[in-house]
């Protein structure tokens, strides 16, 4: 669960109701790194991904008072970023249909709750190697679920894939990671399935 949610909602309200520039800047700083990395997975250009995310935030500012009607700002921003990136691709390359296997993503970290499991530096290294060895689509789905804390259903909608595909890709990712660290995924609740 995103611990920043109440703060994000308050910032969203401040922007919507009072055009609060400071709140807008905080939202930008909070979401920009993840959105830029997500846009990069489509565009493969740092400059274009930065422009795409900037365009998304310009639209957020222009939305003004209607911003309060958005119930899940994080999902809205990821969806807007995806759409903006795909529009850039259409304009730049004439590429109409980008397949999820074409996505490229660099994971900044793999996060697991330390209360659930004590992981040594060697295990972290093994996990990182396992994640990096995942197919591109599988890696992107894993990142969106585990790092960005999106639900399976949200990832399915965001990537225009079936819910079953998301479930299968997460199962594949978790099996590969579990295998890399010598962990039997079937005999433990280490990896919890996100609620649909």
Where are these regions (language model features)?
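N-terminal module of bacterial RNA polymerase sigma factors
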Residues: 1-33, 196
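Helix-turn-helix DNA-binding module
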Residues: 129-132, 136, 140, 148-165
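Sigma70-family region 2
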Residues: 17, 57-72, 92-93
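Amphipathic, Lys/Arg- and hydrophobic-enriched alpha-helical face
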Residues: 28-46, 131
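Structural recognition of an alpha-helix C-terminal capping motif at a helix-to-coil junction
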Residues: 37, 51-58, 71-83
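C-terminal edge and immediately downstream basic/flexible tail or linker adjoining helix-turn-helix-like DNA-binding
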Residues: 3-5, 158, 174-196
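Arg/Lys-rich amphipathic alpha helix in sigma70-family domain 2
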Residues: 79-99
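Internal acidic/polar
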Residues: 5-9, 95-117
């Amino acid at each position: 669960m995103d611990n920043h949610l109440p703060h994000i909602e308050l910032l969203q309200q401040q922007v919507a109701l009072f055009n609060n520039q400071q709140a807008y800047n905080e939202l930008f700083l909070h979401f920009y790194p993840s959105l830029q990395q997500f846009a990069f997975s489509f565009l493969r250009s740092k400059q274009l991904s930065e422009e795409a995310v900037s365009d998304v935030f310009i639209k957020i500012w222009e939305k003004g008072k209607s911003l309060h009607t958005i119930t899940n700002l994080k999902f809205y921003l990821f969806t807007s970023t995806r759409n903006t990136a795909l529009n850039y691709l259409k304009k730049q390359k004439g590429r109409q249909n980008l397949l999820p296997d074409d996505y490229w993503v660099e994971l900044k970290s793999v996060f697991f709750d330390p209360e659930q499991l004590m992981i040594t530096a060697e295990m972290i290294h093994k996990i990182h190697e396992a994640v990096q060895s995942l197919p591109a689509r599988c890696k992107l789905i894993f990142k969106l679920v585990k790092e960005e804390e999106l639900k399976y259903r949200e990832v399915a909608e965001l990537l225009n894939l079936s819910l079953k595909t998301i479930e299968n890709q997460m199962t594949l990712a978790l099996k590969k990671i579990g295998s890399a660290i010598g962990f039997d995924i079937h005999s433990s609740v280490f990896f919890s399935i996100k609620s649909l």
